[in-house]
């Protein structure tokens, strides 16, 4: 019998059916990838499995290790050996690695915590997940990839038999991702099953035994991973064939709009360290300029200098339309028609408790005001409605808190906010991070449309196929230096990486 069986699961929120008659099976030591667009029902299904939505809140049956599972809460499922690691990690940053791993599961003898035993156990767990860290290290001092490994060690400490990973590599470097995927394969060898949720289809293909696709709350199908291509997965996810993930519309590249000369930036704290080292480049109207490089190459630092949001010291010459400008803060950048979609949308891009509409107009309120204080609400509503329609933001209402939207729809709303400022230069830092394939495709189409309208666009992405798929020209950076500016005529990933790494 299978380790996990979920049979005919249906979940409703009021009159809205979030899941309809979904069934999945998983064997011990098997890796099942769960794919679907944001809002398809993946998270709802996992919340049912983990006891976040308790027995009675849904219809259908769940069997785990040949016994019926009627979980009332997460504690019930953890005791059975089911653990979930969310995209937003749940570790307590101010506590040590050891304290996080044993939180709520302390080893005690006669009412006293067995500190030495926990320390040795923690060392052993960290060894299992290949994390070279002292158990007494504060979690906040670790990188995201290392914190992810602490979460897995915590699950192993609870005798996990089924590990659920939700977008585990969204914020990880390529090296950290490789370590994590190898660890999952190692867990598989020890008969631990895994449900893997990711929008990165290359990872899904590399790691999975089976791939299950959910669309609009319905089970589209589960197939052997070896029989599926990435295009097959995309077609099942979106319900239509996408002939090219990177749509390319011809657009005219016109005059130079931006020129940067000798831009340098220093670390905000360790001021002797250069994060950007004497970088010079140009950008033209209607051009899509990709910026490629490994983590730490200085890409984000460079564009933050252009937008006036860099926290440390920076210097250099910036010219817009051949005229030298002084940009020391975001307000000055916006005055010069430069806008930016930031890398961390939740931290820097949205006010999560505010409505979608208010987020869209937040940066351009001055243009909807009578005088300095009174907002022209009719004009504001018109702008909001037009922006939501143009960018296809899926929301029940403009007043819905933006934090309740999917990542893709949040990103579209941030783009709408930027476009409400009528920019001439648009900077996009990781524009599709944590976004499903359908939303990515729509954002790529929008980037092309904006280039056709003459907007100059800078795109930073950790995904090389994305940079190569949408850019007219690619800047290659490494350790703060600009290594090359390459015209994108049949550029390959290998050529870009070779350029970045060669001395």
Curated annotation (Swiss-Prot):
ATP binds at residues 36-43. Its main location: membrane. It comes from the Bacteria. Keywords: ATP-binding, Cell inner membrane, Cell membrane, Membrane, Nucleotide-binding, Repeat, Sugar transport, Translocase, Transport. GO terms for cellular component: plasma membrane. The keyword Signal does not apply. It is found in: Cell inner membrane. It catalyses: D-xylose(out) + ATP + H2O = D-xylose(in) + ADP + phosphate + H(+). It holds the Pfam family ABC_tran. Residues 4-241, 258-499 form the ABC transporter domain. It is an enzyme of class 7 (translocase). InterPro entries: AAA+_ATPase, ABC_carbohydrate_import_ATPase, ABC_transporter-like_ATP-bd, ABC_transporter-like_CS, ABC_transptr_XylG, P-loop_NTPase. GO terms for molecular function: ABC-type D-xylose transporter activity; ATP binding; ATP hydrolysis activity. Its EC number is 7.5.2.10. It is a peripheral membrane protein. Belongs to the ABC transporter superfamily. Xylose importer (TC 3.A.1.2.4) family. The complex is composed of two ATP-binding proteins (XylG), two transmembrane proteins (XylH) and a solute-binding protein (XylF). Part of the ABC transporter complex XylFGH involved in xylose import. Responsible for energy coupling to the transport system. This is Xylose import ATP-binding protein XylG.
């Amino acid at each position: 019998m299978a380790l996990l069986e979920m049979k005919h699961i249906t979940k409703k929120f009021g009159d809205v059916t979030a899941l309809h008659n979904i069934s999945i099976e998983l064997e011990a030591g098997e890796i099942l990838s769960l794919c679907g667009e944001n809002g398809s029902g993946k998270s709802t299904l996992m919340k049912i499995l983990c006891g976040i939505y308790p027995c009675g809140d849904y219809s259908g049956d769940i069997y785990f290790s040949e016994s019926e599972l009627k979980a009332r809460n997460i504690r019930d499922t953890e005791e059975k050996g089911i653990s979930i690691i969310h995209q937003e990690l749940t570790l307590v940053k101010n506590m040590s690695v050891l304290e996080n791993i044993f939180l709520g599961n302390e080893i005690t003898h006669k009412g006293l915590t067995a500190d030495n035993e926990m320390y040795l156990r923690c060392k052993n767990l960290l060894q299992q997940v290949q994390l070279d860290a002292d158990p007494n290290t504060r979690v906040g001092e670790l990188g995201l990839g290392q914190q992810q490994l602490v979460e897995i060690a915590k699950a192993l400490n609870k005798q996990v038999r089924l590990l659920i990973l939700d977008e585990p590599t969204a914020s990880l470097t390529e090296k950290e991702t490789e370590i994590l995927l190898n660890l999952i394969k190692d867990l598989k060898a020890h008969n631990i099953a895994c449900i893997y949720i990711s929008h990165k289809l290359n990872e899904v293909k590399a790691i999975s035994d089976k791939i299950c696709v959910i669309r609009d709350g319905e089970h589209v199908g589960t197939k052997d991973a070896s029989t599926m291509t990435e295009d097959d997965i995309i077609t099942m996810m979106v319900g239509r064939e996408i002939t090219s993930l990177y749509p390319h519309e011809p657009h005219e590249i016109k005059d130079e709009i931006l020129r940067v000369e000798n831009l340098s930036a220093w670390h905000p704290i360790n001021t002797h360290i250069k994060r950007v080292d004497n970088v010079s480049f140009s950008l033209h109207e209607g051009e899509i300029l990709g910026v490629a490089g490994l983590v730490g190459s200085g890409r984000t630092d460079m564009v933050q200098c252009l937008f006036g949001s860099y926290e440390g010291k920076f210097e250099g010459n910036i010219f817009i339309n051949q005229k030298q400008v002084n940009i020391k803060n975001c307000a000055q950048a916006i005055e010069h028609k430069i806008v930016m979609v930031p890398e961390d949308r939740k931290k820097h891009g949205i006010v999560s408790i505010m409505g979608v509409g208010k987020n869209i107009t937040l940066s351009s309120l001055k243009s909807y005001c009578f005088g300095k204080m009174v907002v022209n609400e009719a004009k504001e509503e018109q702008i909001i409605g037009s922006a939501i329609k143009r960018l296809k933001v899926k929301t029940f209402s403009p007043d819905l808190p933006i934090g309740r939207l999917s990542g893709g729809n949040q990103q579209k709303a941030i783009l709408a906010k930027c476009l409400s400022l009528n920019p001439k230069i648009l900077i996009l830092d990781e524009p599709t991070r944590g976004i499903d394939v359908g939303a990515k495709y729509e954002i790529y189409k929008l980037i092309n449309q904006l280039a056709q309208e003459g907007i100059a666009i800078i795109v930073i992405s950790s995904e090389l196929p994305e940079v190569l798929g949408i850019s007219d020209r690619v800047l290659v950076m490494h350790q703060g230096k600009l290594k090359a500016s390459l015209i994108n005529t049949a550029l390959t990933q290998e050529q870009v990486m070779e350029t970045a790494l060669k001395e």
